[in-house]
């Protein structure tokens, strides 16, 4: 049986980002991104969405999964910046 690595869930990531926003550890890229504001985060999300599309067209499934994970990360950072909860988004699914 193949052993898998520990998996971080969507909820785990959101909790981790919230903790970083609250504790503001020195040198945290998440804190720097939050401090950069919604405009910068929006630009990053557009960049990552483009990379997802390109990976879907031209890359392996593994590379695509990596790009999607980055898009999810930056989307959650934006959610944190705006004060949205996971439930705010889940209600729209």
Swiss-Prot record:
Functional pathway: Amino-acid biosynthesis; L-histidine biosynthesis; L-histidine from 5-phospho-alpha-D-ribose 1-diphosphate: step 2/9
Keywords, alphabetical: Amino-acid biosynthesis, ATP-binding, Cytoplasm, Histidine biosynthesis, Hydrolase, Nucleotide-binding
GO biological process per UniProt: L-histidine biosynthetic process
Ranges in coiled-coil conformation: none
Enzyme class, UniProt record, top EC level: hydrolase
Official protein name in the record: Phosphoribosyl-ATP pyrophosphatase
Natural source organism: Mycolicibacterium paratuberculosis (strain ATCC BAA-968 / K-10) (Mycobacterium paratuberculosis)
Gene3D superfamilies: MazG-like (1.10.287.1080)
Entry EC no(s): 3.6.1.31
NCBIfam families the record matches: histidine_hisI (TIGR03188), PRK00400.1-1 (NF001610)
GO terms of molecular function: ATP binding; phosphoribosyl-ATP diphosphatase activity
Classification via SUPFAM superfamilies: all-alpha NTP pyrophosphatases
Catalytic activity: 1-(5-phospho-beta-D-ribosyl)-ATP + H2O = 1-(5-phospho-beta-D-ribosyl)-5'-AMP + diphosphate + H(+)
Example of a GO cellular component annotation carried by this entry: cytoplasm
Subcellular location: Cytoplasm
Major localisation: cytoplasm
